[in-house]
């Protein structure tokens, strides 16, 4: 039988639910607060676990098929970290959205606000590495490990706890659509 830690056993049903849905904040765009670029601790990170459960620190999660995907420029204020030059909608989505859709999405998510006077602009540049498919097809495990070390160092530097990439999959299903992110033997 698996043993449940006393700290977990002591959680209320509400706190356990918060732990499972992540950093959802109904006062910060509702559902939009959990879709990409949703971290308040590391600007541009994909999301984080909740900060609302006492004695459980939040975990920051970043994605990116070619290294960490974080905002390059950002500022911090009392509400958290905010990207400069980006909206709450990930840039990769913008290419597929019409101008009216972008307008309403920015309206819904709070748009692209710049820093107030006196806020210091900060920078976080991440190393670009080849996508998972290219790394796997090199059959060079030492090189793959080196790329992992690079990303791991940057995760420590920027305060990211979990990297949501690359995945491991075979490319036999066309329904996936994100095959470029996977380690695989299939070209």
What do these predicted ranges mean?
Residues 1-187:
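Glycoside hydrolase catalytic-domain context in secreted enzymes
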């Amino acid at each position: 039988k698996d043993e449940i830690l006393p700290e977990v056993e002591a959680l209320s049903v509400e706190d356990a639910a918060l732990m499972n849905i992540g950093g959802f904040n109904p006062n910060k765009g509702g559902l939009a607060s959990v879709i990409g670029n949703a971290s308040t601790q590391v600007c541009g990170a994909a999301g984080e676990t909740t900060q609302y459960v006492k004695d459980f620190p939040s975990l920051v999660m970043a994605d990116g098929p070619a290294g960490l995907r974080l905002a390059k420029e950002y500022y911090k204020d009392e509400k958290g970290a905010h990207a400069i030059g980006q909206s709450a909608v990930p840039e990769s989505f913008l290419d597929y959205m019409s101008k009216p859709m972008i307008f309403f999405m920015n309206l819904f998510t709070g748009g692209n606000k710049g820093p107030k006077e006196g806020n210091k602009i900060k920078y976080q540049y991440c190393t670009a590495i080849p996508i998972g498919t290219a790394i796997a097809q090199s059959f060079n495990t030492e090189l793959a490990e080196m790329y992992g070390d690079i990303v791991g160092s940057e995760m420590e530097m920027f305060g990211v706890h979990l990297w949501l990439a690359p995945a491991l999959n075979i490319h036999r299903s066309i329904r996936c659509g994100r095959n470029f992110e996977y380690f695989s033997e299939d070209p």
